[in-house]
Amino acid sequence: MRRRIGCVVLAGLLCAGMVSATAFAAVDWKQLQGAEIRFLMNKHPFTTYIEPKMSEFEKMTGIKVTLESFPEDQFRNKRLIELNARGKVDGYMIMPGQDELHYWKAGWLQPMDAYIADPALTEADWDLKDFFPSFTKASSVEGKQIGIVINAETSLLSYRKDLFTRLNVKVPETMKELEEVAKFFHGKEVDGKKMVGITLRGKGAAATSQWVDFLYSFGGSWTNAQGKSNFASAEDIAAFKFYGDLLRNYGPQGGAMLHWAESTSSFMEGKAAMIYDANVFKALYENPKESKVAGKVGYATIPAGPAGRLPHVSNWSLSINRNSAPERQKAAWLFIQWATNKNNCLGALLAGVPAGRASAWNSKEYKSKDDHQDWTANTMKSFQLGQPQWNPPVINVPEIRDITGQVIVDAIEGKDVAASAKKAAELMDKKMER
C-alpha cells in the first residue's frame, strides 16, 4: 500500500514540476552541442589510442575537440607556458605525482567532484569506484579530484624465470632474500655469460622513482609529521643504504650511471638475473626482436621490507583548466568522462596501455589474451598496495629529486650514508622553506 501511495505521490510531484525529470534521465550528451575545446596532450600510447576515436565523441556530442600532442619534454614546456599565460587551454594531460601540487597552487586545476556527482553530467555506469583507489587518491589534492587516470604504472621485480627454475632458486619474498638471491647469481657463469645479481637505476634523480618503493617498504617517508625532511631517520637511512649496497655489491659496474635505458638493456642482454623497474617495461623484455630474454621472464611484487610490501603507483591523468570558461569546462568533463569510460579503458588496455580500471583487467576480453598472467596478477596486486606519493610532496619536485639522488649515488659509492642523508635533509628543508 505504501509503495502504491509513493508512486502516486511521485507522479504528482513530477507533473507539478516539483521533482526534476533529469534526476531520472540519462545524460544528454548533446547539451553542449557547438562547444569547441582544446586539450594539450603528451605523445603517449593513450593519445595514440584515443585520437582515431575522436569522431565518435564529436558525433555523439556535437562538441569539437582539438587534441594537440607533443613529445614529452616539449609538451611539459608548452603546457606550462600556455597555462601561465592563461592561453585557451581547456584540458590537458598531467602526471599528478610530478606536477599536481605546483599546478594546484597556481590555480590551474579544476576540481571535478561536482561534475562527477551531477547526474545531468555523469552517467551512473561511468563509476568512479571502478578505478583502483590508489590512483583515485593519487589524482587528488586536498580531497579534491583533479584528474582521471588514463595510464596506470607501478614497478615490479622481474627475474630470469628459466634460471630460477633450472637452479632451483626461490623468488625472493623479503628484502633479506632479495639480497641473498642477488649474491647467489652475482659472478655466476651461465650459458657462457658472467651474470650480475641485479640491475637497478642508480643515476641520481632518475633512481628516486624506484628507490621510493624501498623507502616505503623500510618504513620510511619523504617527510615527517611536522612536514620536514625525514631523510635523517633510521628508516630512511636504512632504505638508502640497502639500495646502494645492493647495486654496488651485486649490480653492473658503474651503477651510479645507470638510467632506465642502461638498466633494462643489461637485463635484456641476459647479463642480470633480476631487475626492479617499471612494470611497463614488460613490452621491452618480451620483444623477441630486441630482447634475448623474451619468454624467459617472471614477475613479482617488491619483496617485503620491515614495513611490508609497499610499491609506489604513478599515472598520467586528464585534467581540466580552472581558468577555462564554465561551459567549456563542462564540455571538457564530458570528453574526459567519455575517454575514460569502461569501453575505452578496456580498449586502451588491449592496445597495451595499462588501465586504471579494475573492470578492464578482470574482463574476459583481456584475460583471454593475457599471455603473462604473473605480470597481470602482480601488477594488480601492486596497484592495490600502491603508495600514491611517488615523488616528494613539494612544489619544487625536480630540486628535491636531485637532492635525494645524490644520497643514492653516495650510497652506491659506499660513502657515509648517514652523513649524506643528514646533509640532504638540511638542504631539503631549506628548499621547502622558499
Predicted segments with their positions:
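Hinge/lid segment of periplasmic solute-binding proteins
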Residues: 25-31, 97-154, 210, 294-300, ...
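Short, solvent-exposed loop/beta-turn-alpha elements that line the ligand-binding surface or hinge
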Residues: 30-34, 113-131, 189-190, 196-202, ...
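Extracytoplasmic/periplasmic solute-binding protein
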Residues: 137-150, 155, 179-229, 272
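Extracytoplasmic "Venus flytrap"/periplasmic binding protein-like
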Residues: 55-131, 162, 166-173, 266, ...
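A bilobed periplasmic-binding-protein/Venus flytrap-type ligand-binding module shared by bacterial periplasmic
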Residues: 158-161, 313-327, 350
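Glycine-centered hinge/linker elements that transmit conformational signals in sensory
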Residues: 181-184, 225-257, 302
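Conserved C-terminal helix/tail region of periplasmic/extracytoplasmic solute-binding proteins
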Residues: 30-31, 36, 59, 64-65, ...
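Long, aromatic- and glycine/proline-rich binding clefts that accommodate carbohydrate-like moieties
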Residues: 26, 129-130, 297-302, 350-406, ...
